[in-house]
């Protein structure tokens, strides 16, 4: 307060307001890319305006800021963007973070299910398209990606090539001869190289934004012209000056790295215009450390971490799949069954899982649109007592920056909890396909990660790890310890990696402050007391130890009364509406329910329990409709049978009472 001494009293509120703004600014979410990088940072609103009907092609990286492989690859992608920033009139490099909740719908509409995903978009694209997948035979290193970019540009149709684009095709010997005779107003550099070489085309694109110079490439197929110009080997560069002088450039050893700089340094060669700012109004701001992180007890498991992870799974990761079929559908059904039977959730979440599981069992379909599942998850049928938080709120899984920890941490905690619940509730999976199967949770986790987990490299690592030893698990307790061991293996592998949170280092867990009895020393060598570890894991992930702190049920009830978690927009596919706007999801389940006029949120929330819960037993509108249909059908059937037998009985009476003559 001493800082305010001597200030006019009316100035203090203004200073406090400025202080709040500064604090709010430091708490902004991080992404892997910032305005200092040479990439265009896109979001749900800007991606359509940038990509479609653009005069340049685009190469986009769809990534997730929590994905370890994306974090590791970010420096390479930044270096690529810097390396080809002069190519912007031909192609631009962009990124879109699919971990941002506002971008869920965008990534779904572009069909992104794995991270990172790379897509090419042609110039002058008018209709909505999901782009062309990056196809690299080898790696994703800078040189490889540059060559794939050139192949994409060179094979683009004529209507996707602006007149300003340079020609990447080789010129003929006659064209070379015509360039040697008259004086020209600009420099002409001819790069002789083999047909499979990319260096000449890279230099052409490097000089695309520079005036007073034209760069072409030629093949060494015409021996006489090579002898005439004194070219003895390739690659070589022949420079024709505006004054008519021409000759080989001999002081350049490497075509791409040095020749581009040499040509840019020629007299009167100037850059036409500075590159457009790639991120004006698009970037999220410079990454800063989140100093407002809640203080939490590391010895506790928080329900909000589990429910936030479940929200992300059902509304983001799985929602990226437009339909579920085959092995994906089977995996999803088994995953929901495991959740319904073992998830240590609160009643309203468990009722949602129960409803979802029963609905899936009752659907004898080989293909299910995920929008139908979303309608149920978002409780479009307004079944009372069903809701799931519609946002992520990390507590024990919160990192020092918003792109660290989060969902992967929550997924580990979720499956640790499920393995413990399977052990302490041995009859929970009775009368299911997993009855008496000690590896039920592990195999379901393995299949889920293989089919749905967004980080493809992480999924490959886990699959390789599970393939080796998971079959050795014979009891539920062994399943608990197997997952604990493998989690520590992953922690050891990722220790010191770019994806590691410096405030939460990857260590062998549980640490001695959480469970001193779990650790022992034999001859100065550390070892685990696995009996104590097992007991600790059962306590830590048991129902009694899950903290409901930060999980306010009243807050969740207010969410259920509004939109039940349905807040993700969808992409409008019409060319004239290429922005992300608020639209209702396809109401697959609502087609069976009579539409009601819109009401205020207060009246809607007040009526929801009355209109849905019939006689207190939780019948939905669909249930009531089916009951009415069954009642009417049964009544009609009974009436038909009544008249049928009555008619027959009359015929019998007439026959028996007929007088004999």
Swiss-Prot record:
Its cofactor is FAD. It is an enzyme of class 1 (oxidoreductase). It is a single-pass membrane protein. FAD binds at residues 405, 412, 416, 457, 461, 484-491, 506, 509. Binds 1 FAD per subunit. One of its GO terms (cellular component) is Golgi membrane. Residues 400-509 form the ERV/ALR sulfhydryl oxidase domain. GO terms for biological process: protein folding. Keywords: Disulfide bond, FAD, Flavoprotein, Glycoprotein, Membrane, Oxidoreductase, Signal, Transmembrane, Transmembrane helix. Residues 30-155 form the Thioredoxin domain. Gene3D superfamilies: ERV/ALR sulfhydryl oxidase domain, Glutaredoxin, QSOX sulfhydryl oxidase domain. One of its GO terms (molecular function) is protein disulfide isomerase activity. It comes from the Eukaryota. Disulfide bonds join 67-70, 98-107, 397-409, 455-458, 515-518. Glycans are attached at residues 53, 390. The active site is at residues 67, 70. Belongs to the quiescin-sulfhydryl oxidase (QSOX) family. Catalyzes the oxidation of sulfhydryl groups in peptide and protein thiols to disulfides with the reduction of oxygen to hydrogen peroxide. May contribute to disulfide bond formation in a variety of secreted proteins. PANTHER family: QUIESCIN Q6-RELATED SULFHYDRYL OXIDASE, SULFHYDRYL OXIDASE 2. This is Sulfhydryl oxidase 2.
